[in-house]
Amino acid sequence: MSHSKSSQRWLKEHFSDPFVKKAQAEGMRSRAAYKLEEILKRDRILRPNMVVIDLGAAPGGWSQQIRKQMGDSGRVIALDIVKMAPLVGIEFLQGDFRDKAVLSQLEIMLKGQPVDLVLSDMAPNKSGIDVMDQPRMMYLAELAMDFADIHVKPGGSFLIKLFHGVGSDGYIRQLRHRYKKVAIRKPLASRKRSPEVYILGDGKLTQNEVSCS
């Protein structure tokens, strides 16, 4: 299939997508908000007054969904290397979360508050070549897991997008040593042909529990 035909097919599918239409009608910045909504309803990991960090947040659909679910309570801190237009009730930090200066700024923003939930909907710019895209995705996933290891409090949760493929099973095994419950989710808003899945780690183990597991 030619590039132009592929692009035309994507555009047609995109604009006829019910979740795209719903996002436009409800003022959500992306259809991804409804993937998160389904997971939150199913797994009930979000409660009032939580502190939530959204990695790779732009354009902001996940942050919007968290704020919608928590109302005026708690804090939502969105992090991204690219600029994100302001959202009511969302604190935004622009920068690379691997950067020590950015992490220092995050610590200042947190003011010692423990983090209840870390989200990551990050993905690399796709080339369409699996042998290139999958390692890039797993690299981002490892970075996000390291971030969650440091920032999520014991008993807290971590939700991340993965591409199912080389390295994903091993990654899930790593999470099983870190969280009491690990679940794999494929929301309705996730296109069937997409390799993406969402992995939830709930009930972060303490260091003593990790050592005994």
Curated annotation (Swiss-Prot):
Keywords for the protein's UniProt record, in alphabetical order: Cytoplasm, Methyltransferase, rRNA processing, S-adenosyl-L-methionine, Transferase
Cellular compartments annotated: Cytoplasm
Protein EC: 2.1.1.166
Pfam families in alphabetical order: FtsJ (PF01728)
Binding site for S-adenosyl-L-methionine: G60, W62, D80, D96, D121
Enzyme class: transferase
Keyword RNA-binding assigned: no
UniProt KW Transferase keyword: yes
Official protein name in the record: Ribosomal RNA large subunit methyltransferase E
Major location category of this protein: cytoplasm
MF GO annotations: rRNA (uridine-2'-O-)-methyltransferase activity
Higher taxonomy: Bacteria, Pseudomonadati, Pseudomonadota, Gammaproteobacteria, Lysobacterales
GO CC terms: cytoplasm
Family: Belongs to the class I-like SAM-binding methyltransferase superfamily. RNA methyltransferase RlmE family.
InterPro entries the UniProt entry points to: RNA_methyltr_RlmE, RNA_MeTrfase_FtsJ_dom, rRNA-MeTfrase_E, SAM-dependent_MTases_sf
Active-site annotation: K161 (proton acceptor)
Function per UniProt: Specifically methylates the uridine in position 2552 of 23S rRNA at the 2'-O position of the ribose in the fully assembled 50S ribosomal subunit.
This protein's encoding gene: rlmE
Reactions the enzyme catalyzes: uridine(2552) in 23S rRNA + S-adenosyl-L-methionine = 2'-O-methyluridine(2552) in 23S rRNA + S-adenosyl-L-homocysteine + H(+)
